[in-house]
């Protein structure tokens, strides 16, 4: 049973989140964005 609301909804897949920053992180799955990179090997990560 959920006791909190999920006001932030992904416009692409409809998945709902309780916090805006969780939705923002989720959108990288759809966009393919990888904003974090390793300083040692230069690989990018989501």
UniProtKB/Swiss-Prot annotation:
Pfam families: zf-C2H2. GO terms for cellular component: nucleus. It comes from the Eukaryota. The keyword NAD does not apply. Disulfide bonds: none annotated. It is found in: Nucleus. Belongs to the snail C2H2-type zinc-finger protein family. This is Escargot/snail protein homolog.
């Amino acid at each position: 049973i959920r006791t909190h609301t999920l006001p932030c909804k992904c416009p692409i897949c409809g998945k709902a989140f309780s916090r805006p920053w969780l939705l923002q992180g989720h959108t990288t799955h759809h966009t393919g964005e990888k904003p974090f990179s390793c300083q040692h090997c230069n690989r990018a990560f989501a």
